[in-house]
């Protein structure tokens, strides 16, 4: 135990480890806040669809040889979020079909572009890193950390400022419209915020694992608590704790950061399931 603590203390002295912890906590917090809303609206796989769009956008940036791909990926993902929302409201193309269509299309086009216009000698490594997250936390630069901090503050501020409206749109959209709430506007706001979170999380967990940050904390919290506020707070706390444990475990074990975080979240979901079952029996 002493050896482990000494090893952690040694690693925490390095800036790149602190960067990973900061980014991991902020991304976990933001994704869990929106995750509860997306799960309750049965739109949780929008994160999966947009993450594949972000992969395609990164492929375009690689083809154009853009060194700082973040702005381009952000713009394309936000535009896709808006289009996805509009397409999902189409009576001929339902929400789940729209997500599947955009998700698979973006993933295929992205991989095709990376093969045709490959500028790297290690294409398989680049694709694996993009899909499953960087195997090394050394890739997080100070610029990315500050960008993540700024965007995370914006996301949390939006959620707090419009909490009541988001709550109304989440539970009964028709009633919210009847009371004068512009449900379409707040749905659009949610989609844009999710797009921002997706782009920020890609370097940490990769495009294929982002949905886990959205889904698992919300489902875990719902097993224990019933009210929207309690579920949201619990999901945020669980997500932050799992990210911290996952990052620290990946440092000690030398495993990929994203996969380790998701594995910890799966374990937390299992414990929450057991706790919910025990509480359910006790209440009876």
Place the predicted regions along the sequence by residue.
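Hydrophobic alpha-helical transmembrane segments
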Residues: 21-25, 70-75, 97-101, 145-150, ...
């Amino acid at each position: 135990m002493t050896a482990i603590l000494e090893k952690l203390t040694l690693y925490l002295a390095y800036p790149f480890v602190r960067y990973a912890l900061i980014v991991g906590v902020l991304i976990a917090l933001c994704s869990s806040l929106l995750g509860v809303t997306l799960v309750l609206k049965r739109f949780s796989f929008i994160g999966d669809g947009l993450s594949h769009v972000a992969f395609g956008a990164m492929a375009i940036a690689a083809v154009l040889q853009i060194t700082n791909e973040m702005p381009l990926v952000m713009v394309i993902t936000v535009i896709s979020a808006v289009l996805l929302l509009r397409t999902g409201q189409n009576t001929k193309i339902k929400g789940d079909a729209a997500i599947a269509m955009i998700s698979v299309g973006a993933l295929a086009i992205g991989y095709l572009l990376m093969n045709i216009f490959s500028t790297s000698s290690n294409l398989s490594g680049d694709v694996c890193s993009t899909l499953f997250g960087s195997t090394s936390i050394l890739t997080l630069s100070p610029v990315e950390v500050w960008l993540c901090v700024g965007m995370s503050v914006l996301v949390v501020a939006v959620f707090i400022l419009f909490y009541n409206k988001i709550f109304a749109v989440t539970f009964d959209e028709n009633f919210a419209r009847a009371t004068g709430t512009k449900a379409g506007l707040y749905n659009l706001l949610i989609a844009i915020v999710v797009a921002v979170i997706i782009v920020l999380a890609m370097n940490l967990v990769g495009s294929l694992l982002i949905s886990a940050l959205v889904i698992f904390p919300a489902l875990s919290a719902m097993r224990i608590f019933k009210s929207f506020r309690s579920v949201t707070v619990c999901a945020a706390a669980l997500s932050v704790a799992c990210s911290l444990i996952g990052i620290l475990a990946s440092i000690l074990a030398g495993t990929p950061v994203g996969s380790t975080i998701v594995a910890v979240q799966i374990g937390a979901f299992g414990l929450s399931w057991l706790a919910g079952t025990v509480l359910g029996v006790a209440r009876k």
